[in-house]
Curated annotation (Swiss-Prot):
PANTHER family: TRIOSEPHOSPHATE ISOMERASE (PTHR21139), TRIOSEPHOSPHATE ISOMERASE A (PTHR21139:SF17). Gene3D superfamilies: Aldolase class I. This is Triosephosphate isomerase. SUPFAM superfamilies: Triosephosphate isomerase (TIM).
Length: 248
């Protein structure tokens, strides 16, 4: 069994200004963070430079999205090369808000994953079902189909973290119970064992995203197949430190 390093990503989404983010970064920089936890903060693209220069080197920086090619006439998009040039090492791809607010489909997300990895960015690849899909009993069908397209575009799984984010639990205050999260993570790990390899199944970090707070993070972190979190709103608050230290 591979030892999987606990991973906590903070997705700032479209929030903050220089003043508030500087205050947040100062709080993180002076906090006692569990050394066995990998921490990544995903800043709005316009603040990537600001975040990288302002955060302690023990905290990595991610972009929240990128495009599938290196350059060109794609107004408003940013490339993995640009993200790297700002000093960031990670990118979030396939987030439910990109899928459901901006209409990104599995094929496009797969192409983005492939290009980001080719460009030497590490990827937080997101999957997850909507409430109606869970209620219809199709959770596995949905997340396995999403995972399949991502997997077709990954050559090196060492640079990928898979984030399971039930869409019904994002920003709603609803959270999957620790048992619900563990059940899905366990099924995902079994999918990788059956479809990719035993080695990838054992080593791949599968993290949970969906209204993670200081109040529920420890119980979620205690689950065997939950290897960390992708945190939204709480990553902008001091409680993010408690979430980072959920396994301390």
């Amino acid at each position: 069994m591979a030892q999987r390093r606990f991973f906590v990503g903070g997705n700032w989404k479209m929030n903050g200004n220089k003043e508030s983010l500087e205050e947040l970064m100062s709080t993180l920089n002076t906090a006692s963070l569990h050394e066995d936890t990998e921490v990544v903060c995903a800043a709005p693209s316009i603040y990537l430079d600001f975040a990288r220069s302002g955060l302690d080197s023990r905290i990595s920086v991610a972009a929240q999205n990128c495009y599938k090619v290196a350059k060109g006439a794609f107004t408003g998009e940013i490339s993995p090369a640009m993200i790297k040039d700002c000093g960031a090492d990670w990118v979030i791809l396939g987030h439910s808000e990109r899928r459901h607010v901006f209409g990104e489909n599995d094929e496009l997300i797969g192409q983005k994953v492939a290009h980001a990895l080719e460009s030497d960015l590490s990827v937080i690849a997101c999957i997850g079902e909507k409430l109606e899909e869970r209620e219809a009993g199709t959770t596995e069908d949905v997340i396995f189909a999403q995972t399949q397209v991502i997997a077709e575009n990954v050559m090196d799984w060492e640079k990928v973290v898979l984030a399971y984010e039930p869409v019904w639990a994002i920003g709603t205050g609803k959270t999957a119970t620790p048992e619900q999260a563990q059940e899905v993570h366990e099924k995902l790990r079994a999918w990788f064992r059956a479809n990719i390899s035993e080695e990838v199944s054992d080593s791949l970090r599968i993290i949970y995203g969906g209204s993670v707070t200081a109040a529920n993070c420890r119980e979620l972190a205690s689950q065997t197949d939950v290897d960390g979190f992708l945190v939204g709103g709480a990553s902008l608050k001091p409680e993010f430190i408690d979430i980072i230290n959920a396994r301390a």
